[in-house]
A protein has these predicted regions:
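Extended charged/polar low-complexity repeat regions
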Residues: 1-306
Length: 306
């Protein structure tokens, strides 16, 4: 991992990052107010800035210095960039609500809170034909419970709009490029394209929030999943194709399809570093993979031993 501060036109000849640094646009590369991070000489750069205050051109350093940095953009090894715009105040403060790509196209990300979605659902319930049974606050709560990762603020992406296109400035679409709906628990329910056609649908286990039990692409059959008591998938059911069963043992997972073909995955490591180190395929062949102490792939051996 490299952490670099802007303000320098070039890196020394032979430096690992010299070519990647030189591909950055000058306004990024020469700005001492930006920090950049990368974990590869192939990129991308993660551009770290701040959204609270933009320094003036005459400022040597922002005053006061920000106590932390946030992701404000990306730059790849060809100099193409993505720039993120964040909300400065309100319920969405700090959230990304705008993106500009390397071609100059500007996109608006419409975010909603759990309270907004709950109010919309209750209003829709009152105006529906079944208004005798309005949606209760308990059925669609205004807040979401915390998760193992911390508090859930309930903020979700609801739509993506194209706001500016330099190539076609007068031909902007009158509908969002994509639209998303959610369950009362904040789970992704459906995805719609720019023609308002539903292209994805998801179903969840009511007893286990966030556990997807089915999903479907438009025009395709619904895929369903069964879980064991520990939350692991034990069966994947496809009514129009191959289904799979999963058997979990110590350091191995056996996968059997609906044609009774079997593969065995041998694993090593624990928690986030568990990796598949050997795969026994249905035809009897074996492939192997090697990893370093950080869990990064270092070698692969095919079925012929190469």
């Amino acid at each position: 991992m490299w952490l670099v501060r802007g303000g320098k036109a070039t890196q020394p000849d032979g430096h690992t990052l010299a070519r990647l640094w030189g591909a950055l646009p000058p306004d990024i590369r020469l700005s001492p107010h930006l920090y950049l991070a990368t974990n590869s000489a192939q990129g991308p750069w993660w551009i770290l800035g701040w959204s609270e205050r933009v320094p003036g051109a005459e400022d040597l350093l922002p005053a006061p210095l920000p106590p932390y940095r946030v992701l404000t953009g990306l730059a790849d090894r060809f100099g193409r960039t993505l720039t993120y715009r964040r909300e400065a105040a309100g319920d969405l403060a700090g959230e990304i609500t705008g993106v500009t790509d390397g071609a100059g196209r500007e996109f608006r990300l419409v975010l909603t809170t759990q309270a907004q979605r709950a109010e919309e659902a209750r209003t829709s319930s009152l105006s529906s034909s079944d208004s005798s049974r309005p949606l209760s606050a308990s059925a669609f709560p205004d807040t979401l419970p915390g998760t193992e990762y911390g508090p859930d603020r309930g903020i979700r992406l609801s739509a993506v709009w194209l706001m500016h296109d330099p190539a076609y400035p007068e031909s902007l679409p009158g509908a969002p490029l994509a639209r998303y709906t959610y369950t009362e628990a904040g789970e992704l329910l459906a995805v719609y394209d720019r023609s308002n056609t539903q292209v994805r649908a998801f179903t969840y286990d009511a007893q286990h929030p966030g556990r997807m039990v089915a999903h479907r692409y438009a025009g395709r059959p619904e895929m369903r999943y069964r879980y064991d008591d520990t939350g692991r998938v034990v069966e994947q059911l496809n009514p129009a194709g191959l289904s799979y069963r999963y058997l979990y043992e110590q350091d191995r997972i056996t996968v059997t399809d609906s044609l009774n073909r079997r593969e065995v995955l041998h694993t090593e490591g624990g928690a986030g570093l568990k990796r598949v180190v050997k795969k026994e395929l249905a035809d009897g062949s074996v492939t192997r993979s090697g990893y370093d102490a950080a869990g990064r792939l270092t070698a692969q051996t095919d079925a012929a031993g190469r």
